[in-house]
């Protein structure tokens, strides 16, 4: 009987340990959400709803920038869903980055007139196409080009 008890205990403990290892632990992060906040009531409603989320450590509401910042062990999708459940259906994750983080802030995809001061929209930087017209223009005025003087 001792061997059977040992084996059953071994396999049952191994099963529970593997379940515990599969469960992901949430990481500490800051979630920024853009949501239109009109009045004190809206601000209070959003703050109460978001602070009730399990794992939320701090909640800051900036009415001027239409921004809600949540710090803690939270899931961004869950925070967004909670803000939308308060009646703010147009809530979205913060689409802006600081002006200094973008190489070309006035590019067509990055510049946004509605962005708060000091911020531009998140966008991928445009990559140069191989064989683009820039290369052709550079070789047009090159010293190695025998027909360059005809253009000038």
Curated annotation (Swiss-Prot):
Propeptide regions on this chain? 150-152
Primary site of residence = membrane
Name the PROSITE patterns for this protein: HMA_2
Q: Where is the HMA domain?
A: 28-91
**InterPro entries listed in its UniProt record:** HMA_dom, HMA_dom_sf
> Annotated region Disordered: where?
123-152
Where in the cell is the protein located? Membrane
Compositional bias, Polar residues, is annotated for 142-152
Positions bearing Cysteine methyl ester: 149
Report the family membership. Belongs to the HIPP family.
* Subunit: Interacts with ZHD11/HB29.
Could you tell me what this protein is called?
Heavy metal-associated isoprenylated plant protein 22
Organism this protein belongs to: Arabidopsis thaliana
């Amino acid at each position: 009987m001792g061997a059977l008890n040992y084996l059953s205990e071994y396999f049952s403990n191994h099963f529970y340990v593997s379940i515990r290892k599969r469960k992901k632990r949430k990481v500490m992060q800051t979630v920024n959400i853009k949501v239109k906040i009109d009045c004190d009531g809206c601000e209070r409603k959003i703050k109460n709803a978001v602070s009730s989320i399990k794992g939320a450590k701090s909640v800051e509401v900036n009415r001027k920038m239409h921004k809600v910042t949540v710090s803690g062990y939270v899931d961004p999708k869950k925070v967004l869903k909670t803000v939308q459940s308060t009646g703010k259906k147009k809530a979205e994750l913060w689409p802006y980055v600081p002006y200094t983080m973008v190489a070309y802030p006035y590019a067509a995809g990055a510049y946004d007139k509605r962005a708060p001061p000091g911020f531009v929209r998140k966008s991928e930087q445009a990559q140069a196409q191989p064989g683009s017209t820039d290369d052709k223009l550079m070789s047009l005025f090159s010293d190695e080009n025998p027909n360059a003087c005809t253009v000038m």
